[in-house]
UniProtKB/Swiss-Prot annotation:
Transmembrane segments: none annotated. The keyword ATP-binding applies. Keywords: ATP-binding, Kinase, Nucleotide-binding, Phosphoprotein, Serine/threonine-protein kinase, Transferase. It comes from the Eukaryota. This is Probable receptor-like serine/threonine-protein kinase At5g57670.
Amino acid sequence: MISCSEEGSNKILVAISLDRDESQNVLSWAINVLAKPSDTVVALHLLVGEEPRKLPMKKKKRTQIRHAKAHVISMLGEFAYTCCHNQVNLEAKVGFSSNIGRGLIDEVKSISAHYLVLSRPTTHEFRIWNDIKRYVSDFAPSSCSVVLVGNQRKPHKDCYSDSAISLDINSEKYSPRSVLNTLSRDSLSSSGDDASSFNGSMVSSSFASPSDKPKHKSISPYKFISSLIMNSPLRKWRGSETKNKPKPQPLIQCFTYNEISKATNDFHQGNIVGIGGYSEVYRGDLWDGRRIAVKRLAKESGDMNKEKEFLTELGIISHVSHPNTALLLGCCVEKGLYLVFRFSENGTLYSALHENENGSLDWPVRYKIAVGVARGLHYLHKRCNHRIIHRDIKSSNVLLGPDYEPQITDFGLAKWLPNKWTHHAVIPVEGTFGYLAPESLMQGTIDEKTDIYAFGILLLEIITGRRPVNPTQKHILLWAKPAMETGNTSELVDPKLQDKYDDQQMNKLVLTASHCVQQSPILRPTMTQVLELLTNGNEAEIAKSWRMPKDMTNDDDDNNEWDDYSMIFGYDVPSDSSF
C-alpha cells in the first residue's frame, strides 16, 4: 500500500486487466481526475476461477498468482509519486472469482467502495465486457457509482441504470461535427460538471437511456457551426438585451471561402504574419475596410488532434467576450477550417519585447499590458459561464491592440474545467517550454494555478525583457530568483528602460511574480488575489499574510527543485518551443 495521508474520505475500486496500456489509462484517470486528497484508490485484478483453498497450491496456480501480483504491484509503482503528491492512498489486490461481475460487486461491498471504475477493453471480447457491465450496473449498491472509461461503442439496450455513470471516450476521428457537437453540449450545460477530456479524447457523461437521447439530423458543418455560435451562452446573454428587436444579427459571422480568399489575396505568402505548430495566420482586408487576421489550419497537417485543437478554439472563443481577450469576428468551414479575428496592428507582446528594432516598450505600456493580461485571465477563470484554463499563456499569445491594450489569444489548448473539479489530467503534456508549471510538466495535471504560474513567468519577461528560455542563458526564473529573494528589484529591470520606470509599479509586478511562480500550486495566489497584488502591492491582504515563501529561499542549488527544467531538458533548447 502506498499511503500519503489519513484514512480516505472516498474509496475508489479500479478494475485492471493484464493489458498494461489499458490499465495505466484507467488508473491515471482515477488517480488524477476522480480522486481527491485523502481518497483511497484500490487497484483490483481478478483471476477467473475458484479461490484455491488447499495448501500447497499447484505450481501452475502459484505462478499465475505470482505473475498477477507482480503485474499489479508494478502498475502501482508507476503512480507512487503522483499519489503522494496528490495525497491519495493507493492499494493493490488480486482475487479469484468464477464470475468477474460478481467478484467486483463482492469487493465493492467488502471495502464499502464509493466508486467502481471499469475500463472498456480494446482487445477483449465485447460480449463478455457487456455482461460484466450489465451485472455491475444491476447489482451495484446505491452508495456506489459505476464509472466506465474507454472507447465508445454502440450502447447495449440494457446497459443503463440509475446507479451507473457512463464515461465514454469517443474514439472516432474528429470532424467539425463530432468535436463541435461535444462543445455545443458542454456549452449549454450550466456548470460543465459532467464533461471534460482525458488522454486527448472527448469524454461525456450519460444518465439517460438510449431512447431518451436526442437524435441529430445530418446538417452541413456550415449550418452546424452557425447554430453553435448562435446558441452560445454569450450570444443568449447579448441577445436578451435586444429581444424586442425583430431579428438580431449574429455577432460572429460565417464567412464564405471567396470572401476570405479575396481579403488575403488568395492567401498570398506575402500576407503571412504568423506560423504556428498547426496553423498559418494571414493579414487581409475585407470589402468593408475592416482589416482581419485569418487563421488557417495548415494544409499539410494530417494530425486529427490538431484539427480538434482548431475546432476547440472555435468552440471556446465563441463563448468569450472581454476587452482583454481576442475578438473573434467569424469562421469559415469551406475548403478547410478558418478563424477570422480582428487584426492587431501592434503585433504580439513577444515581437514588441524581443524583435522590435525601432525601440522597446516603455514602462507605462508594459505595466498596462501586465494588468490587462491579469484582467483577461481573471475573466477566464472567474467570470465565464465555464471555468476556462488557457494552458498556453505566453508573450506570443498576447496581441497588442491599437492603444497597446493586451488581448489573450490562441485557445487551441484551452480546457473547460467543471466547477466541482479541483484539477484535471492531460496526457500527453502540452504547452510551451519555459512557461509550463512544474506539476503540469511532471504529472500532467492542470488547473487555474497552471495559468497563474505561466502568468508569473510572463511578468518576469515584461520586467526583464529576457526570453523565458535562451540557449545561452539560464531559464528566466533561475536567473531572477536571487534578486527576488534579496529584494534587489533594480537588478531585474530591463536595461532598455534606462531606469525610466515607476518604482512602486515595478515593485508590485516583482511581488506578484514572486508569488505566481511558486513551485507548489497551493502557494500561488488566485487571479482575484493577483489583481489585488497588482493594485495594492504590499498593502494587499494576501501580501500582509504572506512573506517570501520558503521554497524561494532554498540556497542548495544542487537539490533545488526549481532546477527541474534544466535536469530534464537542459538549457540548450529553442526560445519558444511547444510540445
